[in-house]
């Protein structure tokens, strides 16, 4: 049977019988090492008794083996060619057949999903992208969209109102028109405070049985305590803590009148409350706010925090089933805004000239006359309302799960042109520009760009904070920067910046690239500009991103030395803004260029350009402050040695990370992603892990608020020097230990893997 099979098989190759061969690699006697001899099994059987070696092949057998070899070579060649071709097609940029294959694949996808972009073959670099961005922005008339948003169709648009929702839907439709990767809305049910539609708020002067009405204000302060209080009235300048400490009279049991400006309404009220005041009146004085209209009404809020104060630390989703609670930042005293005319009427019944150091007009007086009291009645009511945040995303091409967020407040009490229309208009135009750059010009961001329209910003960044609270556990792992576009143009003279230290260096480089539209000089004018950076305030939507979520944030504006006087008033109109800033279009265009360069730089570069080394100087400054109290610390039997060690570990970790970056293979996306992830952790790890986000939402040890902050630690030591009996040593010991371990934790996170951490702390 085997012989028949062999015979049949051999007939395929010329009819010659095939047999197994045996190769002998034995060294020959003559020394020739290259000779290979073959023995045919059939020949061996015929010559079993002889030692004769068969070395001659028949021609036809040779042809059969040659055919085998040729086929094998061809097959291996084809396999190698296909592997090489496919590998090459993946590595090179889209060319020739690869381009056609990729375009065909993308064309199929676009039929099913209109939001997908068709890749282009061009490759743009930083210089190309800057030029492209500038050209795109030059062709836009920003004032057109600002005027459109200022029409009666969309104003006034208090949070949750029908006009606010109308604008939300308009923005949502535009995002769809821009062909974003995805557009969605975020819905929350929040409690805000509004004026009572039946009972007015009222300020009166009571003198015995006489009641003299001062004003029934149209404006109000949201989240004020509702109720009535009566007492002596005293002036406390701007209502800062220092102002209260320097007063020559007590405010205990009295109402306080303070000027608007310098700090937020909420901080003024909290300070007054801490000095046992029973109520607060806020007005705009002539020097700080040189407005013509003495009876101008204005609006604000008194929540010392952000977000919905009735769901502190957790999101206001409709299905949330937490028991009723409220933020500790809500005031326990009534607060009301009054016009300048009402304030001057009160001053006529007061005595004592205000100090010259206050730099205030002569009408200002200090204390209400004897036998007179002021009565404040606040009838504000809570209202539950639905709010909508609108989002659109351009997904990154390399790391779509890493994103920058660009946002602007949409709502406003009154017309809100400078407060929200400028920022919203800028947001929409930036979204359109980046959509065009990707779909038409070949821009390929490595990371994603999220455009966000927030509402309820007038009540303390409620929309933005609720979104952050809803995704607290994951956002810091994904979002690496927030850019705030609120109030970007309030003047022309100054360019002011508030930001995380991680963004200082990048902002400086952008300022060296962008020119002021009026004088033509670069925005970078002073090598010491970092010292002029202002901290993010509570009423800035970027604040909760930084202090609550640990996401680096930046906010900037073109403005004057004085505050813009019409924010939060019925005169925040397009006509007045264009009167104050005739070059509005150029100023908004420049603000767009600053924001646009931020977006490009942070989504285009392989390295995440966050300067983690900037916190070295912040830590050093903190250590210098502590050194003033070395003797006090020693008296308590404590040492700063471990704090020095933690700061040193942070310095070494930043140096090691910089070295790792310089030594890294920049084309290796996996290596660069690991380095970028370490950089992303820096800001988040400055949030104290030892306090609850519900009890102390702003956990950042540099920019937050509470006993866990570094500033609170220093203040506690100052208190020891002033009044040792009021000093709490146990609290200080906890503050010192937890601050040390928080800083050490940041150093450990920067170091990378656990085996790279110096454990000799």
Curated annotation (Swiss-Prot):
Residues 229-346 form the PA domain. Glycans are attached at residues 248, 252, 318, 723, 728. A motif (Endocytosis signal) lies at residues 20-23. Residues 87-761 are extracellular. It is found in: Cell membrane; Melanosome. A lipid is attached at residue 67 (S-palmitoyl cysteine). Residues 1-67 are annotated as: Mediates interaction with SH3BP4. The keyword Cell membrane applies. Residues 1-65 are cytoplasmic. Pfam families: PA, Peptidase_M28, TFR_dimer. A motif (Stop-transfer sequence) lies at residues 58-61. GO terms for biological process: acute-phase response; cellular response to leukemia inhibitory factor; cellular response to xenobiotic stimulus; intracellular iron ion homeostasis; intracellular signal transduction; iron ion transport; multicellular organismal-level iron ion homeostasis; negative regulation of apoptotic process. The chain crosses the membrane at residues 66-86. GO terms for molecular function: double-stranded RNA binding; Hsp70 protein binding; identical protein binding; protein homodimerization activity; protein kinase binding; protein-containing complex binding; protein-folding chaperone binding; transferrin receptor activity. One of its GO terms (cellular component) is cell surface. The modification Phosphoserine is found at residues 10, 19, 24. Stearoylated by ZDHHC6 which inhibits TFRC-mediated activation of the JNK pathway and promotes mitochondrial fragmentation. Stearoylation does not affect iron uptake. N- and O-glycosylated, phosphorylated and palmitoylated. Signal peptide: none annotated. Keywords: Cell membrane, Disulfide bond, Endocytosis, Glycoprotein, Lipoprotein, Membrane, Palmitate, Phosphoprotein, Receptor, Signal-anchor, Transmembrane, Transmembrane helix. The modification Phosphothreonine is found at residue 21. Residues 570-761 are annotated as: Ligand-binding. A motif (Cell attachment site) lies at residues 647-649. Cellular uptake of iron occurs via receptor-mediated endocytosis of ligand-occupied transferrin receptor into specialized endosomes. Endosomal acidification leads to iron release. The apotransferrin-receptor complex is then recycled to the cell surface with a return to neutral pH and the concomitant loss of affinity of apotransferrin for its receptor. Transferrin receptor is necessary for development of erythrocytes and the nervous system. Positively regulates T and B cell proliferation through iron uptake. This is Transferrin receptor protein 1.
């Amino acid at each position: 049977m085997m012989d028949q099979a062999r015979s049949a098989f051999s007939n395929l190759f010329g009819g010659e019988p095939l047999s197994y061969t045996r190769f002998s690699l034995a060294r020959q006697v003559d020394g020739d090492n290259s000779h290979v001899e073959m023995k045919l099994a059939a020949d061996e059987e015929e010559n079993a008794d002889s030692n004769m070696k068969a070395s001659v092949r028949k021609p036809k057998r040779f042809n059969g083996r040659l055919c085998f070899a040729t086929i094998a070579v061809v097959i291996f060649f084809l396999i190698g060619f296909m592997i090489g071709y496919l590998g090459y097609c993946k590595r090179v940029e889209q060319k020739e057949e690869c381009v056609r294959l990729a375009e065909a694949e993308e064309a199929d996808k676009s039929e099913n999903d209109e939001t997908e972009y068709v890749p282009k073959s061009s490759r743009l670099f930083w210089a190309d992208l800057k030029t492209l961005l500038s050209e795109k922005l030059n062709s836009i008339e920003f004032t057109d969209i600002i005027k459109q948003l200022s029409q009666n169709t969309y104003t006034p648009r208090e949070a949750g109102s029908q006009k606010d929702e109308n604008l939300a839907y308009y923005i949502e439709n535009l995002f769809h028109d821009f062909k974003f990767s995805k557009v969605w809305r975020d819905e929350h049910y929040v409690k805000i405070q509004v004026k009572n539609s039946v009972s007015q708020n009222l300020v009166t002067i009571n003198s015995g049985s006489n009641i003299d009405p001062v004003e029934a204000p149209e404006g109000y302060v949201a989240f004020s305590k509702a109720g009535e209080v009566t007492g002596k009235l005293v002036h406390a300048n701007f209502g800062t803590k220092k102002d209260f400490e320097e007063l020559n009279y007590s405010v205990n049991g009295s109402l306080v009148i303070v000027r608007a400006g310098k700090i937020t309404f909420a901080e003024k009220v909290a300070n007054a409350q801490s000095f046992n005041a029973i109520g607060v009146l806020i007005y705009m004085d002539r020097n700080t706010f040189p407005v013509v209209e003495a009876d101008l009404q204005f609006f604000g809020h008194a929540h010392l925090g952000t977000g919905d104060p009735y769901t502190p630390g957790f999101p206001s989703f409709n299905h949330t089933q937490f028991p009723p609670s409220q933020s500790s930042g809500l005031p326990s005293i009534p607060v009301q805004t009054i016009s300048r005319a009402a304030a001057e009427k009160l001053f006529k019944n007061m005595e004592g000239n205000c100090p010259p150091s206050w730099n205030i007009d002569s009408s200002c007086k200090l204390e209400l006359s004897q036998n007179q009291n002021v009565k404040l009645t606040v009838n504000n009511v809570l209202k539950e309302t639905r709010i909508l945040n609108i989002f659109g995303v351009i997904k990154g091409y390399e790391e779509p799960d890493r994103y920058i967020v660009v946002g602007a407040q949409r709502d406003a009490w009154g017309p809100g042109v400078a407060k929200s229309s400028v920022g919203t208009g800028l947001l929409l135009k930036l979204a359109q520009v980046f959509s065009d750059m990707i779909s038409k010009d070949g821009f390929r961001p490595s990371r994603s760009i999220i455009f966000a329209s927030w509402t309820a910003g007038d009540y303390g960044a409620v929309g933005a904070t609720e979104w952050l609270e809803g995704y607290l556990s994951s956002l810091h792992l994904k979002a690496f920067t927030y850019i705030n576009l609120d109030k970007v143009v309030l003047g022309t003279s100054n360019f002011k910046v508030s930001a995380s230290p991680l963004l200082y260096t990048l902002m400086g480089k952008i300022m060296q690239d962008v020119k002021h539209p009026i004088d033509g000089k670069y925005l970078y004018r002073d090598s010491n500009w970092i010292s002029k950076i202002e901290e993010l305030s509570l009423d800035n939507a970027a604040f909760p991103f930084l202090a609550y979520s640990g996401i680096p944030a930046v906010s900037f504006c073109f403005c004057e030395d004085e505050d813009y006087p019409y924010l939060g008033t019925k005169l925040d109109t397009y006509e007045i803004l264009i009167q104050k800033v005739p070059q509005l279009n150029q100023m908004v265009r420049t603000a767009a260029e600053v924001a646009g360069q931020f977006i490009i730089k942070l989504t285009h570069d392989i390295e995440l350009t966050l300067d983690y080394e900037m916190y070295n100087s912040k830590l050093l400054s903190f250590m210098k402050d502590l050194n003033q109290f070395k003797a006090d610390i020693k008296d308590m039997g404590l040492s700063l040695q471990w704090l020095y060690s933690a700061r040193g570990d942070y310095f070494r970790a930043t140096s090691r990370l910089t070295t790792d970056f310089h030594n890294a293979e920049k084309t290796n996306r996996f290596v660069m992603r690991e380095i970028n992830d370490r950089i992303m952790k820096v800001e988040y790890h400055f949030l104290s892990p030892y306090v609850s986000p519900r009890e102390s939402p702003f956990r950042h040890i540099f920019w937050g608020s509470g006993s866990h902050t570094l500033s609170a630690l220093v203040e506690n030591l100052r208190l020891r020097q002033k009044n040792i009996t009021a000093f709490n040593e146990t609290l200080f010991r906890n503050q010192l230990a937890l601050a040390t371990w928080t800083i050490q934790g940041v150093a450990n996170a920067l170091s990378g893997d656990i085996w790279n951490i110096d454990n000799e702390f």
